[in-house]
């Protein structure tokens, strides 16, 4: 971006907040309020004010709510959170925030009395996604535009479904994450994101991890989230902090989304 008449380059920042239960696995017959979300709500509103004052621009947050079979089975309604925290969602809408979906693939197995992330069953995955979009549109009177699948899980079939359902932005991909196992029970495999793109892109229809050309790309955008290894050398982190501080002296973000 060129600088004219003292104008400075502006850096948009997208920051995601997942609205979900405190525990990944819990007793579905004794569901609890989501205390983490409750505790973070007011501080984030103070942050909104501070960020707006610091940048001279409105700060809009990006919220991704759990609407999926685990919530339905445990709380009696897949969209329970929107009812339970209705004042918060009303405030998000008034503030012009983005609200999207963050479903997980948990399935309750009663004989074993345990939750299983059933990534290996594509029909179940599509049920989780479809359920979320259906309830979202009913509650907000519009299609869901933004999406983040739980546990960074994604595949081409699901991206095709997201596009068909009207999603415009997917924020699932975590670049650098290797194919690994969860600590809880699951089926299937998690994606390998070691070679994933780190900048927003429209994916190729045949491979959601590849940038598509003009003739084969999807309408949907992938926005990979920022990732870093906790094993980075401290001296490297120090150099990054210094470089960032120098950079920020001449740049300020226009819009901040948490």
Regions from the language model: what does each represent?
Residues 2-91, 95:
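Active-site beta->alpha N-cap acidic-glycine motif
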């Amino acid at each position: 971006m060129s600088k004219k008449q003292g104008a400075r380059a502006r850096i948009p920042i997208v920051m995601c907040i997942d609205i979900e239960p405190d525990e990944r696995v819990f007793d579905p017959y004794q569901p609890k309020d989501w205390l983490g979300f409750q505790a973070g709500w007011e501080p984030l509103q103070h942050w909104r004010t501070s960020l707006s004052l610091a940048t001279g621009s409105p700060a809009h947050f990006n919220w991704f709510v759990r609407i999926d079979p685990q919530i339905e089975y445990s709380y009696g309604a897949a969209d329970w959170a929107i009812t339970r925290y209705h004042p918060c969602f009303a405030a998000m809408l008034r503030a012009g925030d983005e609200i999207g979906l963050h479903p997980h693939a948990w399935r309750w197995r009663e004989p074993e009395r345990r939750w299983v992330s059933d990534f290996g069953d594509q029909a179940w995955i599509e049920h989780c996604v479809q359920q979320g979009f259906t309830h979202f549109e009913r509650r907000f009177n519009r299609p869901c535009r933004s999406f983040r699948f739980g546990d960074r899980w994604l595949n081409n079939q699901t991206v095709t479904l997201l596009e068909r359902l009207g999603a415009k932005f997917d924020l699932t991909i975590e670049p650098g994450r290797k194919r690994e196992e969860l600590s809880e029970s699951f089926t299937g495999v998690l994606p390998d994101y070691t070679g994933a793109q780190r900048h927003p892109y429209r994916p190729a229809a045949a491979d959601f991890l590849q940038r598509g050309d003009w003739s084969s790309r999807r309408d949907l955008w992938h926005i990979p989230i920022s990732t870093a290894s906790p094993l980075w050398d401290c001296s490297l982190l120090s150099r990054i902090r210094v470089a960032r501080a120098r950079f920020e002296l001449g740049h300020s973000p226009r819009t901040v989304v948490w």
